[in-house]
């Protein structure tokens, strides 16, 4: 927009506002003067402008946006594509469904409907204005048209709802999204270009990415573009927050006088000055290299600042703007890892019994849990002073703390300290002092970390394989402390995930009446390492409850199932007789209303039953008895009180079978051959590759494995060219990470291309990750199996009939023990481990007479050969019911059939509900 266009646009704004003073229309104010002044060129080139030349508002404070206008002079026709596209682009940015094209000759109203942007009306009243001189010459004419006709007609569209309006915070959220998506690649490329001349930039961003890739920015794979997003969001967030606090912080008001010549360095210096008089360091802290931003992008960021300048915003609008900015930051940067608000609310209300006491979230992420604590306190009329005195939040990652600080700040709390700080959880102790800045006078305050009455957190899920090197020494000391405290009775596995150690470490931060509420992955409920964790937790705490979902995932975009663990600090290491509650919430938390969450937490705290959850309660003695039979903690959410009735008819599975895991060699294309191949017969071994191909209780191999132990020279000597060619085909190949197969497949006592099936032959098999099909299948003769299968071999093959063993394994009790050994993954599959199957139980065949054996085998044969597609349907089929009752009757326990079936079906339905 050139000077003449800007001048006439400002005249237009002035005339609209003079008219609106004397009338009562839906339109209350026009604006845009400030952003017009910034619409300069960059090095002689035009740049993309986000904001319309003129804005109409629905209130005097300019907090409700109605419409944007694009202004040109008559020499630009309203049919000009660039003119039209610019107007529509800016309307999209503002999330508005209409726009005006005004060139002082013709005026066009575009409205967006389901078919896109369409001309809704065109005004030709000023057709005599043909050039720039005419605009001045006929000024009275276009002013009269504007006031007497156009604004009146336009107002009617707002009155009848044809044109929608948007509150400022929604507009701002949309603008932020456009800023990020339009400019992240530009900024990323600019960073890369600068990194060519300064390798420190590249080193810093790559190191940052090594920490951030797994936890942040799941939608980005270029570290420079990902870092560009953090730079853009940092500028936008700081500018927005400075405007929010400008009424109570004089320095922040200096943003109102920034102009198009302000540099990133100057604005960073201003934010530093604001920080010195406030406690918002984590918000205003400079991002490293944030000054490396292209001029056109920087001018647009200044436009955004200018857009916010003249808005006289109420406290509520400011708060909405603040919360919307926080939500946008979460979506753009952290996404799937953010704790859902309703889950955070439930955690807080189930755990906290005393709100007037210190509360900590040591892995606060974006502050969802502390924010829910704050809301809970506000609902009970606890003063802002007490709220800020008692809420503490920390995190290892500084980026997350910026959002936490925003989340805990309101327009009513500007003069209170947010006790938010960066610290590795394993470095926290109650003797430390943390330095904060008083927002009221800028003074430095050293506050001691207290013993906490409540600790609440969504603990990070970091597998043991990728635990940071800097934490390994601390983790080793925690493992040693557990061993020493328990006199060697409890030893956490070295394969324990990161959060295991956090749970134990938190004990040192609690006061004597302390409670802990944690959101965890559910994997610990059915693994060997999880059992050791359970022992360790029971040693240091009274476990009050474990809660899971009975319907679907709690985290929308992450393929994990979760649990809530609530603990009370134990005062003695003596064995507790406390009853542990296993709670399963019937509906997905995210589908519940806030009132329903209140009811759940109230019923829970009162120890009452509830319409919203099922509860099973067991003593430690009962739990230890279940665990001794390899029934996982995950199974205890269901009524399995009948288990003690079967104790005399079952025995450990490894008394009868040797359990094997199928062969894992590392590169299937090499070791599993296509049907058409030229490899010599002696190197071909039938293999069962996948449970997916098993349709019958009597399985057959479904593939061919390459098993060659000869050297290449030996193959050449006997002219086995087929095997030699097959090996040569892969000799120069690399894996998915670019490493040579010769290196990654190398094993002691094996050639890199060698696979020996000897220890992977099985008589019975099942899937390692069953879904709806849970079964055992029998092979005609021991066959080679792939890593995706678990196999069994009868130890005393001359003593037990294979047909009998197949029937007992597939009985309802046999299948129950499979389901009870594992836990549900985020996609609904059951996660089994060889170790868990090995420790599982089966019906004892030694208790059966020959007559009973024949009854069971014949009843099983009546089911037919085919494995049912869904066990839930087949289990209630009359023939299947007859078979299961026959088995139980032979063992003298037919009366508990329905109890077993109910538990079994409920467990499977819950696991598979994630796919609903």
Question: Where do the PLM segments sit?
Answer:
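Class I S-adenosyl-L-methionine
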Residues: 248, 276-350, 824
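Active-site metal-binding core of divalent-cation-utilizing nuclease and nuclease-like domains
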Residues: 26-62
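Charged, often flexible domain-edge or linker segments that flank or initiate folded functional domains
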Residues: 52, 57-59, 63-88, 92-287, ...
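P-loop NTPase catalytic cores that bind/hydrolyze ATP
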Residues: 224-251, 457-458, 500, 508, ...
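Nuclease catalytic cores
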Residues: 1-17
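Signature of N6-adenine DNA methyltransferases within the class I
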Residues: 94, 99, 106, 110-149, ...
């Amino acid at each position: 927009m050139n000077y003449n266009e800007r001048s006439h646009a400002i005249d237009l704004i002035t005339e609209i506002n003079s008219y609106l003073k004397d009338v009562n229309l839906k339109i209350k104010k026009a604006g845009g003067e400030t952003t017009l002044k910034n619409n300069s060129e960059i090095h002689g080139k035009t740049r993309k402008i986000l904001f319309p030349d003129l804005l109409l508002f629905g209130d005097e404070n300019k907090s409700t946006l109605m419409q944007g206008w694009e202004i040109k002079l008559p020499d630009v026709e309203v049919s000009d594509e660039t003119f039209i596209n610019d107007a529509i682009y800016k309307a999209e940015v503002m999330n508005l469904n209409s726009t005006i094209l005004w060139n002082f000759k013709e005026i066009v109203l575009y409205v967006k409907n389901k078919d896109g942007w369409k001309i809704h009306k065109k005004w030709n009243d000023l057709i005599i204005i043909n050039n720039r001189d005419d605009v001045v010459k006929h000024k009275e004419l276009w002013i009269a048209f504007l006031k007497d006709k156009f604004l009146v007609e336009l107002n009617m569209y707002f009155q009848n709802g044809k044109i929608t309006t948007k509150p400022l915070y929604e507009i701002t959220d949309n603008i932020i999204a456009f800023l990020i998506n339009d400019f992240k690649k530009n900024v990323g490329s600019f960073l890369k270009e600068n990194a060519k001349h300064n390798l420190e930039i590249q080193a810093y961003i790559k190191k940052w990415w090594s920490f951030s890739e797994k936890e942040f920015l799941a939608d980005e794979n270029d570290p420079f573009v990902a870092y560009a997003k953090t730079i853009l969001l940092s500028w936008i967030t700081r500018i927005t927050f400075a405007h929010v606090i400008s009424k109570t912080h004089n320095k922040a008001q200096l943003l109102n006088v920034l102009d198009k010549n302000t540099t990133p360095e100057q604005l960073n210096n201003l934010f530093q000055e604001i920080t010195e008089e406030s406690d918002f360091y984590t918000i205003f802290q400079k991002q490293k290299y944030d000054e490396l931003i292209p001029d056109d992008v920087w001018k647009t960021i200044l436009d955004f600042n200018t857009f916010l300048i003249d808005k006289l915003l109420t406290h509520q609008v400011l708060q909405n703007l603040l919360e919307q900015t926080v939500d946008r930051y979460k979506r753009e940067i952290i996404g799937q890892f953010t704790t859902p608000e309703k889950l955070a609310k439930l955690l807080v209300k189930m755990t906290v019994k005393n709100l007037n006491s210190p509360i900590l979230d040591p892995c606060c992420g974006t502050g969802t849990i502390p924010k829910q604590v704050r809301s809970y306190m506000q609902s009970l009329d606890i003063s802002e002073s007490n709220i800020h005195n008692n809420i503490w939040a920390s995190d290892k990652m500084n980026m997350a703390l910026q959002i936490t600080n925003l989340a805990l700040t309101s327009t009513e709390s500007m003069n209170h300290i947010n006790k938010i700080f960066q610290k590795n959880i394993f470095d926290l102790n109650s003797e430390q002092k943390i330095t904060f800045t008083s927002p009221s006078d800028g003074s430095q305050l050293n506050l001691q970390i207290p013993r906490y009455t409540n600790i609440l957190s969504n603990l990070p899920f970091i597998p043991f394989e990728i635990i940071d090197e800097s934490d390994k020494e601390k983790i080793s000391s925690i493992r040693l402390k557990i061993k020493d405290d328990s006199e060697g009775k409890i030893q956490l596995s070295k394969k324990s995930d990161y959060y295991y150690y956090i749970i134990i470490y938190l004990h040192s931060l609690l006061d004597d009446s302390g409670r802990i509420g944690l959101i965890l992955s559910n994997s610990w409920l059915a693994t060997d390492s999880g059992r050791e964790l359970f022992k360790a937790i029971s040693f240091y705490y009274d476990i009050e409850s474990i809660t899971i979902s009975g319907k679907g995932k709690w985290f929308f975009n992450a393929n994990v199932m979760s649990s809530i663990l609530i603990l009370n600090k134990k005062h003695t290491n003596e064995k507790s007789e406390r009853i542990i509650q296993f709670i399963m919430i019937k509906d997905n938390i995210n589908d519940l209303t806030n009132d329903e969450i209140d009811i759940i937490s109230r019923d829970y705290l009162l120890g009452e039953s509830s319409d919203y959850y099922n509860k099973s309660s067991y003593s430690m003695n009962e739990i230890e008895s279940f665990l001794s039979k390899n029934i996982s903690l995950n199974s205890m959410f269901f009524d399995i009180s009948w288990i003690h009735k079967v104790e005399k008819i079952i025995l450990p599975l490894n008394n009868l079978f040797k359990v094997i895991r199928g062969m894992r060699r590392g590169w299937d294309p090499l070791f599993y051959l296509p049907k058409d191949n030229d490899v010599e017969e002696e190197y071909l071994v039938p293999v069962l590759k996948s449970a997916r191909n098993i349709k019958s209780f009597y399985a057959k191999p479904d593939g061919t494995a390459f098993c060659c132990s000869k050297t290449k020279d030996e193959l050449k000597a006997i002219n086995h060219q087929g095997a030699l060619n097959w090996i040569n085909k892969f000799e120069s190949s690399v894996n998915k990470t670019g490493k040579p197969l010769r290196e990654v497949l190398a094993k002691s006592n094996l050639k890199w291309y060698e696979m020996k099936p000897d220890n992977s032959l099985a008589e019975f098999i099942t899937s390692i990750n069953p879904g709806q099909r849970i079964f055992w299948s029998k092979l005609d003769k021991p066959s080679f199996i792939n890593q995706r299968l678990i196999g069994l071999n009868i130890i005393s093959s001359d003593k037990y009939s294979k047909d009998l063993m197949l029937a007992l394994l597939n009985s309802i009790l046999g299948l129950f023990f499979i389901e009870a050994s594992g836990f549900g993954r985020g996609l609904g599959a059951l996660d089994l481990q060889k170790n868990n199957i090995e420790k599982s139980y089966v019906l004892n065949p030694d208790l059966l007479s020959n007559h009973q054996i024949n009854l069971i085998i014949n009843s099983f044969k009546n089911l037919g050969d085919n494995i049912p597609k869904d066990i839930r349907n087949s289990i209630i089929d009359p023939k299947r019911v007859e078979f299961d009752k026959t088995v139980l009757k032979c063992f003298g326990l037919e009366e508990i059939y329905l109890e077993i079936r109910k538990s079994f079906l409920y467990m499977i339905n819950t696991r598979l509900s994630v796919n609903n």
